[in-house]
Structure formats: C-alpha cells, structure tokens
UniProtKB/Swiss-Prot annotation:
Provenance organism: Hepatitis B virus genotype B/C subtype adw (isolate Okinawa/pODW282/1998)
Protein name: Capsid protein
Bias (Basic residues) ranges: 149-176
Organism lineage string: Viruses, Riboviria, Pararnavirae, Artverviricota, Revtraviricetes
Pfam families: Hepatitis_core
Gene3D superfamilies, A to Z: Viral capsid, core domain supefamily, Hepatitis B virus
Phosphoserine: modified positions: S155, S162, S170
UniProt-listed InterPro entries: Hepatitis_core, Viral_capsid_core_dom_sf_HBV
Gene encoding the protein: C
C-alpha cells in the first residue's frame, strides 16, 4: 500500500521532501512545542481537528518506537547490529516523525493554507537554479497573510474604524481563539 499521510491535508510526502532533513527540529523539540502549545487539546477526549488527531497518532507512534528501541538496546547483544538498528531508526523513522510533527504543529500554528503556500514557495525556490533565485529561502513565519485573505474573496482589514461607526464599550472579540482552547 502506498499511503501518503499528508494527502487529506492537501500536501504530499513529495512536497515535504523539498525541505532538507536538517530543516526539521529534533523530535524532542517538536514534542515540547506540541505540549506547550496544544497539550490541553491533545489530552482532551473531544475531537478538535484532524491535525490534532494526526499529532496524537504521531506522538503515540514515536512512543512505541522508543519502546522498541529500548527493547532492542537491551536484547541485541551485538554492538554493531545494535548500532545499525539505532541508526536506521534515527535516520529514516525519526525523519518521518519529525516531518509529521512539524507539518501538523505548523498547520495548527500558522494555518494549513499558509503552510501549503510555504511548501510550494520553498519547492519552487529550491528547484530554481541559484543564479536565478533570491539568496534567501522563503520563511514560514514571514509569508504575507494577505494572500490567504484575498484567496477567500475578502479585502484586507482596515487598520482604523470608520468614523461613522460608534465604538462599542466592551472589548472587541478576537476572531481566532487563544492557544489554550485551540479546538
């Protein structure tokens, strides 16, 4: 079976493969980030979003993989064989988990459309010959939000209220929810 874990989110393994392996933070850093930003939603019995579900599954898979690695470390007596297994897990499985964690954390943090736009931008940048591309790669956190807003058919929000409107005495409600209640 050829299963692409990103397909339902509009991405693909191939799209993420444009990012170099050293682009992705360590699994420990990604787990710490997921915990710091989304612990409540991840531990909640409620369904929050497909990204939360995918994050839960990736975290559980990594935990089981670490249990297996511990077992192999304890039961495989040949040091060379043990080193081969550890190296394979870190290089191949570790990278896949790092990609999964990064993708879903980024989608929850920046929004799926922004992450997909970033992946496409980076893919175009990396495939463009160095002589014809800008010196710096695109950066996820600096992509303009207006692209996403315009794609939905809205004009960018004004910075100042219209003089005809009366200001409400109550604080204005934010459109996005706080990180604590990410569902």
């Amino acid at each position: 079976m050829d299963i692409d874990p990103y397909k339902e989110f509009g991405a693909s393994v191939e799209l993420l493969s444009f990012l170099p392996s050293d682009f992705f933070p360590s699994v420990r850093d990604l787990l710490d980030t997921a915990s710091a930003l989304y612990r409540e939603a991840l531990e909640s019995p409620e369904h929050c979003s497909p990204h939360h579900t995918a994050l839960r599954q990736a975290i559980l898979c990594w935990g089981e993989l670490m249990n297996l690695a511990t077992w192999v470390g304890s039961n495989l007596e040949d040091p060379a064989s043990r080193e081969l297994v550890v190296s394979y897990v870190n290089v191949n499985m570790g990278l896949k988990i790092r990609q999964l964690l990064w993708f879903h954390i980024s989608c929850l943090t920046f929004g799926r459309e922004t992450v997909l736009e970033y992946l496409v931008s980076f893919g175009v940048w990396i495939r463009t010959p160095p002589a014809y591309r800008p010196p710096n790669a695109p950066i996820l956190s600096t992509l303009p939000e207006t692209t996403v807003v315009r794609r939905r058919g809205r004009s960018p929000r004004r910075r100042t209220p219209s003089p005809r409107r009366r200001r409400s005495q109550s604080p204005r409600r934010r459109r996005s929810q706080s990180r604590e209640s990410q569902c």
